[in-house]
């Protein structure tokens, strides 16, 4: 997730549109609070996967917050979750278990979360080895075939 890319704005707009429904379009009920916490926690963990959380990665998260038009409460929840992930204070399996309490494994919402994490990981055009490890584990824990991750990485332009 490190580095910079010219198409970041387009990626954020697409993700904001895709994730808006998952996160309640800015209105946070219980399911949306869980989804927001899981998404941003995993974004923090993904950013941390290559050992350094860059200002670019933080900028991506802030851009995504703007695109999602979260309420003040939603932004606070998202940033707290991102910081937990960034500080390595969460467990991938536990976070996904939380997600599965409000969205079924294999649901459209889980697919959107997966797609968004992959897109942000490749936003700079490359995947570092620890980011790939994170994405591989995420893929398996979501119940997807590893080939799906490879297809998405090719589609989104990872090298």
Regions found by a protein language model. Give the residues of each.
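Small-residue-enriched hydrophobic alpha-helices in membranes
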Residues: 1-45, 52-159
């Amino acid at each position: 997730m490190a580095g910079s890319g010219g198409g970041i704005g387009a990626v954020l707009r697409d993700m904001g549109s895709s994730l808006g429904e998952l996160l309640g379009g800015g209105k946070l009920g219980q399911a949306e609070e869980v989804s927001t916490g899981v998404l941003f926690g995993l974004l923090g963990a993904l950013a941390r996967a290559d050992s350094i959380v860059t200002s670019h990665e933080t900028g991506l998260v802030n851009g995504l917050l703007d695109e999602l038009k979260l309420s003040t409460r939603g932004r606070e929840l998202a940033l707290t979750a991102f910081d937990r992930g960034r500080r390595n204070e969460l467990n991938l399996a536990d976070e996904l278990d939380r997600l599965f309490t409000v969205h079924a494994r294999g649901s459209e919402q889980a697919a959107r979360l997966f797609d968004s994490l992959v897109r942000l990981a490749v936003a700079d055009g490359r995947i570092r080895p620890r980011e790939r490890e994170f994405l591989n584990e995420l893929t398996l824990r979501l119940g997807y075939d590893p080939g799906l991750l490879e297809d998405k990485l090719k589609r989104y332009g990872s090298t």
